Amino acid sequence: MRFLTVDVGNSSVDIALWEGKKVKDFLKLSHEEFLKEEFPKLKALGISVKQSFSEKVRGKIPKIKFLKKENFPIQVDYKTPETLGTDRVALAYSAKKFYGKNVVVISAGTALVIDLVLEGKFKGGFITLGLGKKLKILSDLAEGIPEFFPEEVEIFLGRSTRECVLGGAYRESTEFIKSTLKLWRKVFKRKFKVVITGGEGKYFSKFGIYDPLLVHRGMRNLLYLYHRI
């Protein structure tokens, strides 16, 4: 069986082409690139954080079914579930399915999100700016600082503008992750598996298991529920 899984982000669209349990092709496209492409007329499951772009996706992939939070079989223990993004629930479900009931999910993209699944329940987390967005905003707002693109920069002291900017942004992100992991381990007195995903996930792979297809694997796992979604 051939089908697609689609993850619509704030600035890109990720598409996986599956044949059974294997990914045969994977595309990461900007919104502009996506609109120029043609796709096979296959059934598809998708999630979207950018509803304004979802109908354009439907125009290119007519057989897509966008999933809702309630489609993912995971208990949500969150103060404002009505404002919780489907992407966070989808990632929490996927992490629980493949990595166990106590897991931290780090999703690195436009936003850097770190969420906690505790005893199989989604509990919440923290959200901050992604690495690329930090660099872009700094360049836009600070005259004289050029725009740099994300890199993994492990230095103890920046000695050029490039090193200072990249090192500062990267260290801010890594310290955010380190301090959160330390806090949760102390508060909840547990060891957590840590899984990293997202377009910028490779820069933080040292913190755990890097799984760039995490949410796609979760959606594939839901395919047996397709006719009930």
UniProtKB/Swiss-Prot annotation:
Its EC number is 2.7.1.33. GO terms for cellular component: cytoplasm. It comes from the Bacteria. GO terms for molecular function: ATP binding; pantothenate kinase activity. The active site is at residue 87. CDD domains: ASKHA_NBD_PanK-III. InterPro entries: ATPase_NBD, Type_III_PanK. Its main location: cytoplasm. ATP binds at residues 7-14, 110. Keywords: ATP-binding, Coenzyme A biosynthesis, Cytoplasm, Kinase, Nucleotide-binding, Potassium, Transferase. The keyword Thylakoid does not apply. Its cofactor is NH4(+); K(+). It catalyses: (R)-pantothenate + ATP = (R)-4'-phosphopantothenate + ADP + H(+). A monovalent cation. Ammonium or potassium. Substrate binds at residues 78, 85-88, 161. It is an enzyme of class 2 (transferase). HAMAP family: Pantothen_kinase_3. This is Type III pantothenate kinase. It comes from Aquifex aeolicus (strain VF5). The gene is coaX.
